[in-house]
From Swiss-Prot:
This is tRNA (guanine-N(7)-)-methyltransferase. It catalyses: guanosine(46) in tRNA + S-adenosyl-L-methionine = N(7)-methylguanosine(46) in tRNA + S-adenosyl-L-homocysteine. GO terms for cellular component: tRNA methyltransferase complex. It is an enzyme of class 2 (transferase). The gene is trmB. Gene3D superfamilies: Vaccinia Virus protein VP39. It holds the Pfam family Methyltransf_4. It comes from the Bacteria. The keyword Transferase applies. Keywords: Methyltransferase, S-adenosyl-L-methionine, Transferase, tRNA processing. Pathway: tRNA modification; N(7)-methylguanine-tRNA biosynthesis. Substrate binds at residues 141, 173, 211-214. S-adenosyl-L-methionine binds at residues 63, 88, 115, 137. HAMAP family: tRNA_methyltr_TrmB (MF_01057).
């Protein structure tokens, strides 16, 4: 499948940027805490991404579109030896996560609050151990499918920054997006689907915390799929 990379101005995969008004403390977190944790893409990325973190880390994990932040906070708290980079353009979600980072004194998270493709293009080659794309916007209407984050162009980006043997993990409750991701990844030479049996993609990833998106899917009668692809 051949796709032409769009101009940066059109390369947006998210909808609204802000929802309900922020509380005073949330606004303060955005003003004072986010600048301390935000990646500076005006500067070259360090060759070794562990240098981005104040404490020693051994691995780097990128989560694109962390939403409510439940998964990112859970993973960062349970695995201090991993440095996490979280990307989320939605202001309210970022403000919520910053509050959790402060409350739990998390020190192994760095953040970016705009288009994830900017981060993907900034990161060095073969620098990331795992990429998580969990319950992304499915853009259900066919005319909007080109906005889905999973594309051959973005898989090229993933392939560039993942270390050999690194993982791309995807979760969704939308059948059309699950199939879309399987097709795109199986058409991409750099990725191998790790599943050997149905249980492998019907069972949540190891250490998986339940998220509000997953709970909403269950309430509405939808099951989720958990797909893992290894960088060849």
């Amino acid at each position: 499948m051949t796709e032409t990379r769009g101009a940066r101005a059109t390369e947006a995969f998210f909808g609204r940027r802000k929802g309900k008004p922020l509380r005073e403390r949330q606004a303060a977190h955005l003003e004072h805490l986010l600048p301390l944790l935000k990646l500076d893409l005006e500067e070259p990325a360090p060759a070794d991404l562990t240098a981005l973190f104040p404490e020693p880390v051994e691995r780097i994990r990128l989560e694109i579109g962390f939403g409510g932040g439940e998964h990112l906070i859970h993973r960062a708290a349970e695995d201090p030896a991993t440095g996490f980079i979280g990307v989320e353009p939605f202001v309210n979600s970022m403000a919520k996560l910053l509050g959790q980072i402060e409350a739990k004194a998390i020190r192994n998270i760095r953040l970016y609050d705009d288009d994830a493709t900017q981060v993907l293009d900034w990161l060095p080659a073969a620098s990331v151990d795992q990429i998580d794309l969990l319950y992304p916007d499915p853009w259900p209407k066919r005319k909007h499918w080109k906005r889905r984050f999973v594309s051959q162009i973005n898989l090229d980006r993933f392939a560039r920054i993942l270390k050999p043997g690194g993982l791309f993990c995807f979760a969704s409750d939308i059948d059309s997006y699950i199939n879309w991701t399987l097709i795109h990844c199986r058409e991409h030479a750099a990725f191998e689907w790790t599943a050997e049996r149905a249980a492998d993609w019907l069972t949540p990833f190891a250490g998986w915390p339940s998220t509000r998106y997953e709970a909403k899917a269950r309430r509405e009668g939808r099951s989720s799929a958990y797909l893992a692809f290894r960088r060849a």
